[in-house]
């Protein structure tokens, strides 16, 4: 049972969002950033996501909890925002919001059918298989804060190269800045980066292997710039493909 969905949504957005790249990550309007989108909620929350089709977005389920209205934010060339309606929100049936709060494994994935197409370039999903080892490199792109606690630094898509640490597997992957190794503040997800795509280079092309679910500060403290927690998509690929078909969206 979801306790206080609106309050919980705010708590998740501000305490769990992976930092859309704190630590000096550079803007990334091309490459990985072309597929990243920004989402906002009526309770003051904001997250990232990734376009899988012109009319379909993948994000974290905890970004679109019941009890609020959500919009996709599209920026024009002058960085003026336009709010785009969502037609349908489909959360994975096995998602457990309390698990996200504890940084535990859960099906933290949701699909958003858009009322109208977006300009973003759809990103391909990584095929199943391909084990993840410590030190493997990934690219994360999101709209989160560049400086923790400074809301003015959010809203620009930034990308950061992070590496796997700990014991990566099919249930959860933890990423860190290879320069700081989580021991001091470095690159990583922050507020507004939840739902951001995590890319892996597969045969010279970037493909989405997971999405951001949470972040920590250095030394596993609260905050950003330490660990970036990723929900791998391999075990949910069948569900994503099935739901995309039901929603009438064609995946690349």
Cite the ranges covered by each PLM segment.
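Conserved catalytic-core segment of clan PA serine endopeptidases
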Residues: 22-31, 70-120, 127-130, 152
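Chymotrypsin/trypsin-fold serine protease catalytic domain
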Residues: 106-109, 114-186, 226-227, 233-238
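Positively charged n-region of N-terminal signal peptides that target proteins for export
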Residues: 1-4
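C-terminal subregion of chymotrypsin/trypsin-like serine protease catalytic domains
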Residues: 28-35, 41, 45-46, 51-65, ...
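Soluble periplasmic/extracytoplasmic beta-strand elements of cell-envelope proteins
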Residues: 38, 58, 71, 109-113, ...
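Surface-exposed patches in mature extracellular/periplasmic domains of secreted proteins
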Residues: 99, 123-124, 248-252
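Glycine-centered low-complexity coil/loop motifs and glycine-rich tracts
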Residues: 187-191
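Bacterial N-terminal signal peptides
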Residues: 7-18
């Amino acid at each position: 049972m979801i306790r206080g969905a609106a309050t919980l949504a705010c708590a998740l957005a501000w305490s769990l969002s992976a930092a859309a790249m704190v630590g000096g990550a550079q803007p990334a309007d091309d490459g990985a950033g072309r597929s990243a989108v920004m989402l906002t909620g009526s309770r003051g929350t904001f997250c990232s996501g990734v376009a899988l089709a012109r009319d379909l977005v993948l994000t974290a389920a905890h970004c679109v909890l019941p009890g609020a209205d959500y919009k996709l934010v599209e920026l024009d060339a002058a960085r003026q925002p336009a709010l785009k309606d969502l037609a349908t929100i489909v959360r994975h049936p096995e998602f457990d919001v309390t698990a996200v709060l504890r940084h535990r494994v859960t099906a933290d994935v949701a699909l958003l059918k858009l009322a109208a197409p977006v300009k973003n370039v759809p990103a391909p999903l990584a095929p199943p298989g391909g084990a993840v080892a410590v030190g493997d490199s990934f690219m994360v792109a999101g709209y989160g804060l560049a400086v923790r606690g400074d809301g003015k630094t959010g809203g620009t898509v930034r990308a950061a190269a992070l590496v796997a640490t700990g014991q990566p597997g099919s249930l959860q992957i933890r990423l860190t800045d290879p320069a700081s190794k989580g021991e001091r503040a470095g690159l990583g997800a922050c507020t507004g980066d939840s739902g951001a795509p995590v890319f892996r280079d597969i045969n010279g092309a970037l493909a989405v292997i997971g999405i951001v679910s949470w972040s920590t500060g250095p030394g596993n403290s609260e905050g950003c710039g330490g660990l970036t927690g990723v929900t791998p998509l391999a075990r949910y690929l069948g569900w994503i493909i099935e739901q995309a078909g039901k929603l009438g969206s064609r995946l690349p």
